[in-house]
Amino acid sequence: MKLLEDKILKEGILLEGNILKVDSFLNHQMDVKLFNEIGKEFKRRFEGCSINKILTIEASGIGIATIVSQYFDFCPVVFAKKVDAANMDKDTYESKVHSFTKNKTYNVRVSKKYINKGDKILLIDDFLANGCAALGLIDIIKQGGAELIGVGIAIEKGFQKGRKELEKVGAKVESLAILDKIENDKVYFK
């Protein structure tokens, strides 16, 4: 998606360790106009797919998933919680997820009320690196007896193993901007 690639080139900041900082438009301050175009593009890429729920993980995927929802008949958006809260149902699906960016492992949870047998789920997230977050969410989808329709990613680090890991479990992966490499303080797209 050229619009997203241009935004990355213009506003993205490269940090040590192949970390691309896009907090000015994607995962801290949100460019809603860009998110709207992202939603349209995911609708185009998953056209004809029967989707009745969108699943993401807190926190950065929530904004994108919410906008994407309007292009799939405003289907519910469910997000896996990383932190145990007093008001969280005790009856949950759980999976361990390792964050590449934070180098931390989380036990993510979704209430069993919100993932049901027969649900057709589109997984949405801001980044794909090693695939750990997406694999954890796919595990939760399976625990609930639901069906994964596909995985929509805003930015994929194509030089990491995430896509391969997701394709191993049969996931259809659609990424809007695929980084081929980060070299000499420059981003190169596939």
Curated annotation (Swiss-Prot):
Localisation per UniProt entry: Cytoplasm
Gene Ontology molecular function: xanthine phosphoribosyltransferase activity
Role this protein plays: Converts the preformed base xanthine, a product of nucleic acid breakdown, to xanthosine 5'-monophosphate (XMP), so it can be reused for RNA or DNA synthesis.
Protein name: Xanthine phosphoribosyltransferase 2
Pathway: Purine metabolism; XMP biosynthesis via salvage pathway; XMP from xanthine: step 1/1
Name of the gene: xpt2
Keywords assigned by UniProt, alphabetized: Cytoplasm, Glycosyltransferase, Purine salvage, Transferase
PANTHER family recorded: HYPOXANTHINE/GUANINE PHOSPHORIBOSYLTRANSFERASE, XANTHINE PHOSPHORIBOSYLTRANSFERASE
Cellular compartments per GO CC: cytoplasm
This enzyme's EC code(s): 2.4.2.22
Family designation: Belongs to the purine/pyrimidine phosphoribosyltransferase family. Xpt subfamily.
Pfam families reported for this sequence: Pribosyltran
Binding positions (5-phospho-alpha-D-ribose 1-diphosphate): A129, N130, G131, C132, A133
Gene Ontology BP terms: purine ribonucleoside salvage; xanthine metabolic process; XMP salvage
Subunit structure of this chain's protein: Homodimer.
Residue numbers binding xanthine: L20, N27, K157
Catalysed conversion reaction: XMP + diphosphate = xanthine + 5-phospho-alpha-D-ribose 1-diphosphate
Organism: Clostridium botulinum (strain Hall / ATCC 3502 / NCTC 13319 / Type A)
